[in-house]
Amino acid sequence: MANTITADEIREHFSQAMSAMYQQEVPQYGTLLELVADVNLAVLENNPQLHEQLANADELARLNVERHGAIRVGTAEELATLRRMFAIMGMYPVSYYDLSQAGVPVHSTAFRPIDDAALARNPFRIFTSLLRLELIENRALRERAEAILARRKIFTPRCLALIAQYEAEGEFTSADAREFVQEALETFRWHRQATVDEETYHALHREHRLIADVVCFPGCHINHLTPRTLDIDRVQLMPRPVILMPECGIE
């Protein structure tokens, strides 16, 4: 097929598109990216040895590329479809984390590239958590949450069709890839309108705020992106007018 595109290229386009979308949803995040870029530049100007080390490792070009995002899903079926989606981008589940040990009712994995060449091209990963409804002790509330999740559709019909097309054909044209990225983004877009009534939301929130966040909205919105900084202490010690408060939007 002419004009096919690689998984690395799709992942790169997706990570850039997700960053742009998140900056629209959380304008403070764009300010954070500028702040981190300024700090990184200052660090490199004052540390020629580090600059040379990163240049020799071919890291300079990727310094301002986000490395990490995080999402939460509600059902095993949603997770299975995400696995298919991320595979198109060359991202595969790595490791297992049982966060219930820390009082968080999820278990998690990280979808990321796994071979050296793919990591060198674009190391973007998405930490993905699956809600554990069995940890809701109130049976009626647990069944209500299960029913809500069973009704929701977090993937657009066109996204599902493109996933199936890729699995059948093994490749995308550039046009297919662009459409796929745009359709995939809809799964991770923030929605202000909940899908439940106020009483249900508060009941789930009392059980755990994360349960309400997962169950009560129509998608698995990206809950944070993480830029790479060479000096986290300097970023956090910036003058007060520049500092971004997490509760204002960046989780």
Predicted regions and their residues:
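Extended, well-ordered protein cores
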Residues: 1-251
